[in-house]
Regions:
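Glycan-processing catalytic domains of CAZymes
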Residues: 1-179
Length: 179
């Protein structure tokens, strides 16, 4: 996926991992309580809906319906991996994020129970707007909405120092306001 931008191969690789994890852990330990589908995407990535649906369905089928969740990242102005820039101009708008994730949730909500958006790629003054949209969409599709409060600082030229607690508090308070 990282090289091609196409999620379809993720299904082929991960179906064996799901089987192995269930055989070695899920079927043996009561503490195995659900699944994290680890394909971290941001937007309307080619094949993402089909890949997440196939992986979520396989996880649920093999485990008799245990919960599944995903943790995508928001394609904000701090999504600058592989560059020397601190921010970028072509970040996703709240409206475009809502449109794209409405389509994605529509295609996966029957096999993905929860979504925990990573918050590290958006600015602090954008937290409320994005978190509100995320919660609204999750509610629309009967999914749980969590937050993935990233604890490293993207506002520094050195990548990635631990975040100051005041910044973490801003993230947690924004998540609380969103519900």
């Amino acid at each position: 996926y990282w090289d091609t931008g196409d999620m379809t191969w993720e299904v082929e690789d991960n179906k064996y991992v799901i089987d192995e994890v269930w055989e070695n852990y899920g079927s043996k330990y009561k503490s195995f309580g659900g699944w994290y589908i680890s394909g971290e995407i941001s937007r309307a990535t080619k094949g993402a809906i089909g890949a997440f649906h196939a992986l979520g369905k396989q996880c649920k089928d093999i485990s008799n319906g245990l919960p599944t969740f995903i943790s995508p990242w928001i394609d904000g102005k701090k999504a600058i991996m592989g560059t020397t820039k601190m921010t970028r101009e072509d970040a996703v708008s709240v409206q475009q994020h809502e449109k794209e994730w409405d389509e994605i949730f529509d295609g996966i909500h029957d096999v993905v129970d929860a979504c925990a958006f990573q918050d590290g790629h958006i600015d602090y003054d954008e937290l409320d707007a994005f978190f509100s949209v995320n919660k609204k969409l999750a509610d629309k599709y009967g999914m749980q909405c969590w937050t993935n409060a990233e604890s490293f600082d993207r506002d520094m030229p050195i990548r990635f120092l631990p975040i100051k607690f005041d910044k973490l508090r801003l993230k947690l308070e924004a998540a609380k306001r969103a519900g």
